[in-house]
């Protein structure tokens, strides 16, 4: 028996996160701060899968905190997402449309993606 995931796409910016839930078709905006992210993650079901576009360093807090809470997290390259948008005939490029596109991408292509996991501790020391 396959357990279905609760799929959420999150568009990340320096100041704000915009999420879109595939199952409920609801959008939500929150500040890109650890306290706000923590509150938002606490509201998500345990079987949530989150798809995020790699955005400089602004996505790291969300990705790391979601991973620590046990969520499946998928980090997508912006170039890959841009090509996916073109492939499905998408033209809009807003935070809300990006969040929706990320959720759709994970829903349709998720079986081909590998969940994110933190790099080895030695990597942090090298930086």
Region locations from a protein language model:
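Phosphate- and other anionic-substrate recognition elements at nucleic-acid/protein interfaces
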Residues: 1-127
């Amino acid at each position: 028996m396959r357990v279905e995931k609760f799929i959420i796409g999150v568009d990340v910016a320096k100041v704000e996160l915009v999420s879109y839930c595939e199952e409920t078709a609801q959008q939500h905006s929150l500040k890109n701060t650890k306290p706000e992210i923590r509150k938002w993650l606490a509201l998500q079901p345990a079987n949530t899968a989150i798809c995020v576009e790699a955005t400089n360093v602004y996505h790291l807090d969300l990705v790391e905190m979601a991973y620590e809470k046990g969520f499946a997290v998928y980090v997508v390259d912006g170039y890959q997402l841009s090509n996916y948008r073109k492939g499905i005939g998408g033209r809009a490029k807003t935070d809300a449309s990006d969040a929706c596109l990320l959720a759709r991408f994970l829903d349709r292509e998720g079986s081909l993606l590998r969940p994110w996991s933190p790099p080895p501790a030695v990597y942090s020391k090298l930086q």
